[in-house]
Curated annotation (Swiss-Prot):
Biological process per Gene Ontology, one example term: tRNA pseudouridine synthesis
GO MF annotation, one: tRNA pseudouridine(13) synthase activity
Domain TRUD: 151-309
HAMAP family registered for this protein in UniProt: TruD
InterPro entries reported for this sequence: PsdUridine_synth_cat_dom_sf (IPR020103), PsdUridine_synth_TruD (IPR001656), PsdUridine_synth_TruD_insert (IPR011760), TruD_catalytic (IPR042214), TruD_insert_sf (IPR043165), TruD_pseudoU_synthase (IPR050170)
Protein name, per record: tRNA pseudouridine synthase D
Entry similarity comment: Belongs to the pseudouridine synthase TruD family.
Superkingdom of the source species: Bacteria
Pfam families registered for this protein in UniProt: TruD
Residues the record marks as active site: 77 (nucleophile)
Function: Responsible for synthesis of pseudouridine from uracil-13 in transfer RNAs.
Catalytic activity: uridine(13) in tRNA = pseudouridine(13) in tRNA
Organism (species): Pseudoalteromonas translucida (strain TAC 125)
Length: 349
């Protein structure tokens, strides 16, 4: 993400991020009311220093099913203390106590019956609590807080692209004709390529227009929906933007240029080979909100070089997109585990 433009200029302060697991805490907001009956058991699990797939395998072993039969709303980072929900089909007549899985790194908080399994992306969002250590300029961070509260570019985080951008290297090879037989890996690479093009376009818009300034024509998304429409800027649309009824958006490139504004086509020019490669895959044109606005953002000063940040984000959004506008951070999580994570990376957050 170092090549992407900042909305508020490059931050002055440096800090360490994820020095300990407790420095990065995530609480998944599922937003689902369980039916209390049905063949699917939903489990709320807190994991520390483990990835989502590892916990899914534990649940599968306990239920006597394949890991493919365990579902979850989204992947969560290994390097932190993360609460998330899983589901697995368990016959009503054969109840299982999943608290047997409890250990130093995995704890089952809740177990609920539900009529349907959890699906990827079914959650509402995530609540983050992040501790920054060895902060060199706390005042600069505190001065940026109010600006960041109004929104930051909704960039995809670097974890989407694999270690050292390996997923993008693989994408270039795939577009050049190299076959990728592993279906899951192929999906990860396609997602990374699409996200890269999105980031580059948003970065150009930030540089030339910022996010507060609307263009003559915009493609708007309906809040809480993937539906979008192109329209000229009008008093009505400005009022709808202010109320949160609609949002400005940027393209997730698909099989045609339909839905792109003329300015977006210009910005995508340098990445035409990427757009062509994605288009040949037959992907449906989609949009993603342009501005990421944190919810319930608060900051606590622990000491002269330690700050604790708390905020909520919608599903699919990255805490690092917000963090980079506040501080020049260094990921202090263990290197050897980080290398393993790059192989396990999943497109959903």
């Amino acid at each position: 993400m170092s090549d992407l433009n900042y909305l508020y200029g490059a931050p002055l302060s440096k800090a360490d991020f994820k020095t300990t697991a407790e420095d990065f805490m995530v609480d998944e907001d599922l937003g689902i009311e369980f039916t209390g009956s049905g063949e699917h058991v939903c489990l709320q699990v807190v994991k520390k220093g483990e990835n989502t797939q590892y916990v899914a395998k534990l649940i599968a072993q306990r239920a006597g099913v394949s890991p493919r039969d365990v579902s979850y709303a989204g992947m969560k980072d290994r390097h932190g203390v993360c609460s998330q929900w899983f589901s697995v089909k368990v016959p009503i007549k054969k109840p299982i106590d999943f608290s047997d899985l409890n250990s130093e790194s995995v704890f089952v908080v809740s177990q609920q019956r539900h009529e349907r399994k959890l699906r990827t992306g079914c959650h509402k969002g995530n609540k983050f609590t992040i501790t920054l250590r060895n902060v060199t300029d706390p005042l600069d961070i505190l001065c940026r807080i109010n600006a960041v509260r109004s929104g930051v570019p909704n960039y995809f985080g670097e974890q989407r692209f694999g270690r050292d951008g390996h997923n993008l290297v693989m994408a270039e090879k795939m577009f050049a004709g190299e076959r990728i037989r592993d279906k899951k890996l192929r999906g990860i690479i396609i997602s990374a390529a699409r996200s890269h093009v999105f980031n580059q376009l948003v970065s150009l818009r930030v540089k030339e227009h910022g996010l507060a300034k609307t263009m003559h024509r915009e493609v708007f998304m309906l809040s809480g929906s993937n539906a979008f429409f192109e329209d000229a800027i009008s008093d009505e649309n400005i009022a709808r933007l202010a109320s949160g009824d609609i949002m400005m958006s940027a393209p997730m490139v698909g099989k045609s240029e339909k839905g792109l504004t003329e300015q977006e086509k210009v910005w995508l020019g340098p990445y035409q080979s990427w757009c062509d490669g994605l288009g040949e895959l037959g992907l449906k044109n989609e949009r993603r909100m342009l501005r990421l606005i944190p919810q319930d953002f608060s900051v606590e000063t622990i000491d002269e070089s330690t700050l604790k940040l708390s905020f909520g984000l919608p599903k699919g959004c990255f805490a690092t997109a917000l963090l980079r506008e506040l501080v020049d951070y260094t990921d202090a999580s263990p290197r050897e585990r980080k290398e393993k994570d790059s192989k396990d990376e999943d497109p959903i957050k």
